[in-house]
């Protein structure tokens, strides 16, 4: 561990000023999706997904794990993407703290929350699902508890890292929210077989994850990966298909008994402003 253990409250106090909220400009309790970026930090596609969710009537919160720690994109790309620091099991504390904090927001229906992660963010969510959350140190927190996770209905996991260090390789999940996995057929970080095998951890908990094998590379939905020497290639058609699946999944798992929310004008702001 590279830093002292935070309490859940202290971790949320650190993260909250850097969370960007998208959603209808009202105070009605609405279903919410929390979005967790990949190892290179927040890239434009994360905001695209958040805005799309907001237009459908959901609240969307983009959680930045790097700005609160003073980490630049270059620093994160060099160390986090290389696996030198901040593994999924540590960032899982950010996921838990964000759920705990945002579930208390009066504009959030705490019984209808989805978690969405891309690459490192998806890894962190998956690691969290394997943790009992009963003893200090789990998720790099002093006081982990699964109380806030009761309202987490669904997980959207886009090309999660599933190589060495990913807890789902060796541990079953202990929770079984509805899960939609996106596996990139040409992923250079986690081979297709390993990626699919990691979803077996969800099945061991009684979940029935739906997995879409997208015929693209890791990061296929992220603009900016178009050229050499990156092994990642942006595919706008696949990106649109992934966004459609994301929205359909949110509606299927978060819509209440009254059905689909009417489209609304979305706004964005730093959380709490």
Residue ranges and their predicted role:
Residues 188-197:
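Conserved alpha/beta-hydrolase "acid-adjacent" motif
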Residues 208-273:
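C-terminal catalytic histidine-bearing segment of alpha/beta-hydrolase fold enzymes
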């Amino acid at each position: 561990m590279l830093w002292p253990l935070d309490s859940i409250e202290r971790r949320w106090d650190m993260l909250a000023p850097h969370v960007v909220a998208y959603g209808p400009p009202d105070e009605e309790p609405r279903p919410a999706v929390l979005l967790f970026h990949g190892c290179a930090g927040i890239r434009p596609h994360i905001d695209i997904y958040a805005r799309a969710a907001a237009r459908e009537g959901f609240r969307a919160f983009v959680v930045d794990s790097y700005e609160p720690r003073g980490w630049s994109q270059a620093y994160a790309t060099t160390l986090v993407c290389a696996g030198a620091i901040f593994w999924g099991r540590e960032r899982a504390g950010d996921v838990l703290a964000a759920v705990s904090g945002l579930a208390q927001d009066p504009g959030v229906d705490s019984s209808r929350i989805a978690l969405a992660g891309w690459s490192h963010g998806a890894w962190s969510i998956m690691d969290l699902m394997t943790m009992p959350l009963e003893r200090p140190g789990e998720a790099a927190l002093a006081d982990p508890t699964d109380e806030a996770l009761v309202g987490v209905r669904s997980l959207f996991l886009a090309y999660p890292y599933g190589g060495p260090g990913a807890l789902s390789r060796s541990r079953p999940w202990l929770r079984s929210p509805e899960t939609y996995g996106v596996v990139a057929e040409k992923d250079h970080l986690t081979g297709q077989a390993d990626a699919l095998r990691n979803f077996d951890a969800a099945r061991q908990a009684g979940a029935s994850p739906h997995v879409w094998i997208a015929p693209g590379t890791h990061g296929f939905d992220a603009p900016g990966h178009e050229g050499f020497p990156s092994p990642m290639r942006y595919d706008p058609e696949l990106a649109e298909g992934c966004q459609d699946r994301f929205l359909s999944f949110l509606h299927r798992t978060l819509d209440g008994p009254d059905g689909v929310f009417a489209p609304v004008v979305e706004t964005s702001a730093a959380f709490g402003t």
